[in-house]
């Protein structure tokens, strides 16, 4: 029976939140796009609506329709998963959930203190820096313009939103209620207060608060899923432009990873990987994988992305066209390489990259298994009758030596 529906706006976010339940042995399924809630056999269903880059009205409609379906199918709790850096259509999607659910209020706990993302006096911080002054404030696709959470919400909706003081209850309030949390203990305390009189019909937040849902919903039996043995060879496929990920790749390269940057043509020429030049490039990549146990293939140019921007401008490709074109090309490359005997464990970073790669091999569903690090998810899917594993990571997660540590751990496991 479906006990919890989680609605995410991108693929990596769907996984890093769903794994908070799956890691406790709770049957959890992650799907992209449409979902038949009446036919779902999992206890937890996470739906990636792919609305992060959509206009606000379209994003709201997708969330509203899914929420109405959940209400009609008697789902006990709906959790709107938001980005822990507040990217995307935050206000529009929260308002849509509240409206379609018919709930009196929507508790919103945006913090993820476990990785240094806190909400204090209504302001959202990334490791002590207001989010709009952090790297997320200059994100080329979804820059976060405001750190005060209620103001950010009101950029897209007129639904009332207010920040609650520590210890203040939601019982007599309406609208979107923003909770502070500087520590994981703050999130846990807020959760216990919210669940005092039963399960709230709607909640919102990121993976930070979702980590407490197994206990709060009474779904956890105390078990912990163990990490399966993985192929010690590691290929990192990076489509993220986040500075955190760029530093991680620099560190990995210095530690001996072989690093390949795709050219502007490889990223943006339609059908490139099916061309003679593309097939030759694929053969060279296979040789690289055969000769090197730790590899990176990335979509960033050396020293910035001006070369790709110039290439796109000369062909009339706008910023969104670049985003879609690059992730699509990476997906085509991935599909062509997927059957290679030299392909070991995969780590995909960036939600668009993950989606296109999974599309290329016909995988619409992923099953989160466990977290290797906070926000770093091991998931599995079925391909041609075989179970395949993939590691997923949002661009903004992890320490600088993350890739090196993961590679070492996989090799020793």
Enumerate the predicted regions with their spans.
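A structural-propensity feature for long, helix-poor, extended segments
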Residues: 43-50, 293, 380-413
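Conserved, well-ordered active-site substructure
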Residues: 343-402
